Amino acid sequence: MTLRLLAAVLAAGALPAAADDVKDVLARMDSEAATFHGITAKLSKTEFTAVVDDKSEESGRMWLRRTGHKITMRVEIDVPQPKSVGVEDSSASIYYPRMNTVQIYDLGKAGALVDQFLAIGFGSSGKDLQKNYTVTREGEETVNGEKSTRLNLVPKSAKVLEQIKNVELWIPLKAGHPVQQKVFEPGGNYYLFTYSEMKLNPDLPPSAFRLKLPPNVHEEKPQQ
């Protein structure tokens, strides 16, 4: 019986790989976070609004730079309408080229949610995730051709829970950053971000991660 079992294993090629558990994923994130300083990628975003049962989609490119917990990010949306989004410190800007208008928002204390909402998993250590979230493994799935472990994160902070119900991350079996994120709000809305053509720690100047605006742009501050 033992020889038959061995023969069957050899014929199949090898024993199946052990399942990627939470500790494995968090260890990879710890390792990557130690040297992480930025990433570029193609981005597709799906936004679901529960009250009207509506989905909207956008796609473009993203440049993200992290220094400690400081995030500088630029997103260039091409489809369906061109626009640019920039986030730096506690400020967010949205530029509409067809109107030559930039809207500037003061994120204030909500600026900390950028790390929780937009940049989670990019340079985040596994230790930080465990500190701020209850982390569970939800199985393995393939995203953009990459076998990935899906993690579910529930915020431990009551204040964060007011804004974010939970976050799902798809982490490739050979990487420490997500190829997909899904952020759920308490009311049933969600945001799905999927990434491709990712380049880790690109050799780019800091200016590449900042919003580029024409000198004659019209500024608006909707909060005032």
Predicted region positions:
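Bacterial N-terminal signal peptides that target proteins for export
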Residues: 1-7
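Hydrophobic h-region of N-terminal signal peptides that target proteins for export
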Residues: 8-19
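N-terminal mature ectodomain segment of secretory-pathway/periplasmic proteins
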Residues: 22-94
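Short, mixed charged/polar active-site loops
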Residues: 53-59, 82-84, 100-102, 164-166, ...
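Acidic/charged, solvent-exposed loop-and-adjacent secondary-structure segments enriched in E/D, K/R, S/T
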Residues: 93-121
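Short, solvent-exposed helix-to-loop capping segments enriched in aromatics
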Residues: 33, 113-130
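Gly/Pro-enriched, hydrophobic low-complexity segments
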Residues: 19-24, 103-105, 118, 122, ...
